[in-house]
Amino acid sequence: MAYHWQVIGRLLIALLRFYKRFISPLLGPRCRFAPSCSEYAMTAIARFGPLRGSWLAARRLGRCHPFHPGGFDPVPDAPASSPSSCRCKGPHP
């Protein structure tokens, strides 16, 4: 099943690259943030996978409007995979 998520993530990133390469130049620069929303989405999907990455990208697109000041808004770091960062209540092996 993990393989399917990788394929979906790569497909989403390929679609974003297509947009960035062929559609975005026709529209001109519109993003108020650095990195741009498409770069943010590609990084978020690569870092967190297609589900959480798409959610982060959708939240970012919701903030990209004329009434928001914009600015530098990087993708959050992935949480550490140590047992101390786990939110579960049970013991770890």
Swiss-Prot record:
InterPro entries: Membr_insert_effic_factor_YidD (IPR002696). The keyword Cell inner membrane applies. Residues 74-85 have a biased composition (Low complexity). It is found in: Cell inner membrane. It is a peripheral membrane protein. GO terms for cellular component: plasma membrane. It comes from the Bacteria. Residues 74-93 are annotated as: Disordered. Keywords: Cell inner membrane, Cell membrane, Membrane. Its main location: membrane. Could be involved in insertion of integral membrane proteins into the membrane. Belongs to the UPF0161 family. This is Putative membrane protein insertion efficiency factor. It comes from Xanthomonas campestris pv. campestris (strain B100).
